[in-house]
């Protein structure tokens, strides 16, 4: 399933990435701009998720009253809660499942693009890419940690293109090889080679990427925790919430020592943009503002129904 999703979304995202790279001449800047475009495109989904979260907060008070009323009858309580959700037009799709699913699908596509920088940016033909893959099979078999699997052979190729220049010249034209060499030389961030995997046992400048990835993830997680604690104090008391707050940064730190630096740079960019987006939606679509707007809309709808009913009764009397 994962491979199918990646195979579907990656080609869609690789075209704009290639165009942005041709315009900027910087791979990292191209990733940054593409991620911004995707965040903007998904903003309506994020806003909907924020509004549904606010609506859920408002419904929690009614749900708690139902549970207290039917404390000795869990089946009846669940029936009443479901009836409440139906009246409010609130279902599983509104609870964040659908928006999160959409974002996850796009994220998988982005990961696919990150693991295939050559085919995504330079857009070599599938025949050339397959020939290059066979050349890099030897690197993968040697256990090069930058080519742990066939999924990362393109990143390994960027690191080892000089070593395999002779074999590559047999499958690539002089122009293609020149493009590959130029791209490999630009495949850097702050002077760090994006094809290199940071070594947890060997302190170096590459440690900067895992540290930044962890710190940016931690800031975003703490902000979300404080936000949830304010909106739903009862949920915040759940020990799992505190655990998840630090689990994500810890996993981010661990994984960035397992994957090439380029993947870690993408995570840093994504963490920063997600944090900015969280602040924006929390300010513009704060729960208080959303709930107030919902109450106004419900009042208008209720009065409209009352007026319609009143007119119908008056017409029936005539």
Residue ranges and their predicted role:
Residues 1-318:
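Helix-loop-helix
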């Amino acid at each position: 399933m994962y491979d199918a999703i990646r195979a579907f979304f990656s080609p869609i995202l690789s075209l704009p990435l290639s165009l942005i790279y041709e315009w900027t001449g910087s791979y990292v800047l191209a990733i940054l701009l593409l991620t911004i475009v995707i965040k903007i495109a998904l903003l309506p989904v994020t806003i909907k998720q924020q509004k549904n979260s606010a609506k859920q907060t408002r419904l929690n008070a009614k749900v708690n009253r139902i549970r207290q009323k039917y404390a000795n009858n869990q089946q009846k309580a669940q029936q009443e809660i479901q009836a409440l959700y139906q009246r409010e037009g609130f279902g599983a799709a509104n609870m964040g499942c659908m928006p999160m699913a959409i974002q996850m699908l796009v994220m998988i596509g982005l990961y696919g693009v990150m693991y295939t920088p050559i085919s995504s940016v330079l857009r070599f033909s599938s025949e050339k890419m397959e020939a290059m893959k066979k050349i890099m099979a030897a690197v993968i078999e040697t256990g090069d940690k930058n080519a742990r699997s066939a999924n990362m052979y393109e990143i390994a190729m960027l690191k080892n293109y000089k070593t395999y220049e002779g074999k590559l010249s047999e499958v690539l034209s002089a122009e293609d090889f020149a493009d590959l060499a130029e791209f490999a030389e630009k495949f850097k961030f702050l002077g760090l080679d994006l094809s290199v995997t940071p070594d947890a046992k060997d302190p170096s400048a590459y440690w900067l990427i895992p540290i930044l990835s962890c710190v940016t993830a931690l800031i975003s997680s703490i902000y979300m925790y404080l936000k949830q604690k304010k909106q739903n104090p009862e949920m915040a008391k759940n020990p799992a919430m505190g655990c998840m707050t630090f689990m994500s940064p810890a996993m981010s730190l661990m994984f960035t020592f397992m994957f090439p630096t380029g993947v870690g740079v993408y995570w840093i960019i994504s963490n920063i943009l997600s944090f900015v987006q969280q602040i924006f939606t929390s300010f513009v679509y704060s729960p208080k503002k959303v709930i107030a707007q919902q109450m106004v809309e419900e009042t208008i709808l209720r009065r409209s129904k009352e007026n319609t009913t009143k007119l119908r009764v008056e017409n029936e009397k005539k």
